[in-house]
């Protein structure tokens, strides 16, 4: 039977949660006093939204095939991403066979190279790529993980990212990743508060529970090295994304100087096989964390993961809900997954992209069997108001 072709490509935006998970109401833990690259400025220290972390909003990409099948995906990109999809990328998709994913990715990437490479352009390409995989799964009546070669384990195990690792332990997670609250601009007092927070959590969770620090690009090499060595006393498992993404030399230096047994992780804001090649060949980290909605999508993550495997480096994708679950379950070098605690107080398990997706699975007792519904197995919530700002 002949495969259908792509008939229509549409791009929408939506506000309030969803893929832009920083777009939350007041009082959410993710917008608390958390160290960022902007923490050097006191006026932008108390809230991440104060410097515009949520300005982009969510991008929804919808791709319709000639047989009526519709695939979709969500990522961070908002109106900028919608413009790129409608006015530039759609030409490389419409009329093509739904199986031509590699060619479509290649053309999207090289056509945007002069203004893209990373950032919102790669977010957008990632969203299109994920929608293509969702569409192919629906056309073939298979979950994406089967298209990727099938599962290598029966279930996923998760660590939790959020403000309350002590509650995450009670919920069955294998570890908890804390947002670092104070950066170098807050001097010795900030460093002391960071360590006191870690010590308090270690006291609450005991010795057999992973604790990690998410530093969100906020540190310099000197501070990160001090923090890592001081945190070793409290059994910190890894220190994450300490430095700006382009400081490969700094990451290599940091990794040489952290305590023995502590891992350095990064990659959330890296993109494509070429960016991750730098991290891997320069010995920057022990664990990479590509976001499948930002790094280039599933098509590129396959290549990134293979590179990492050849360097004996684990791949634990950043957040991204079902888009990472379907990948992680198929890879031996992805032994566990991340779950972002999106409840405002990090005190209950709610779907990461709530309220945008329906049927979005969540861990139970820190574990999950990935659903076998076609594609990524989720639906758009019809109660969320989608806006199509551009057409083509």
Swiss-Prot record:
Keywords in alphabetical order, please: Lyase, Magnesium, Metal-binding
Record-annotated residues binding substrate? Answer: 22, 48, 338
Q: What is the species of this protein?
A: Burkholderia ambifaria (strain MC40-6)
Q: Name one GO biological process term.
A: amino acid catabolic process
Tell me the GO molecular function terms. Answer: L-rhamnonate dehydratase activity; magnesium ion binding
Q: Where is this site: Increases basicity of active site His?
A: 291
Query: What do we know about how this protein assembles, alone or with others?
Result: Homooctamer; tetramer of dimers.
Gene name on record?
A: rhmD
The disulfide bridges present are none
Q: How the cofactor binds, per note?
A: Binds 1 Mg(2+) ion per subunit.
Note in the entry: Reaction proceeds via a syn dehydration.
This enzyme's EC code(s): 4.2.1.90
What is the name listed in the Swiss-Prot or TrEMBL entry for this protein?
L-rhamnonate dehydratase
